[in-house]
């Protein structure tokens, strides 16, 4: 397992739990507090055999600030670089190694993924859980013992709400994440 101290990973218990809403709030807050810090945002999607037709791995660099995709939202929030790794279950480690080779030595990494937690030990792992919880994603079940922090969110129409003070409590010291509770 690869240890990456300057990475904060965000997972979610189910779809539409507010993972990207939380991630973008953290990016915005970190850019205000640490304008000189390089922030790289990652989305890692592992495609399981039989469910998708992708083989190998592919890394996409998001450049469209107008995109409504999660990666576009991260770029709009202030990330300096946004990469999306899509890989099949047989090429996860190879894809992650290639992705990490493109990371800056200085700065911080914010990664959205449940499954990648089985391959990467981040400095901080946060799980976003819906208050009106439905069925947990299989990928969430496999990493439920790992989160340092669990955040509850609730749906309000089509938007997700959570306590915004939580994003403000995430700090960076020496390119490492710290939580001020």
Model-derived regions, located:
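Phosphate-binding P-loop
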Residues: 1-7
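C-terminal accessory "lid"/substrate-recognition subdomains
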Residues: 2, 41, 66-68, 76-77, ...
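Short, high-confidence coil segments that cap the C-terminus of an alpha-helix
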Residues: 5, 36-37, 79, 104-107
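General beta-strand structural signal in soluble alpha/beta enzymes
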Residues: 9-10, 41, 83-86, 109-112, ...
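Glycine-rich phosphate-binding P-loop
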Residues: 9-26
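N-terminal phosphate/diphosphate-binding loop that engages ATP/GTP or pyrophosphate donors
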Residues: 26-87
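Conserved catalytic-core segment of NTP-binding enzymes
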Residues: 101, 105-108, 113-181
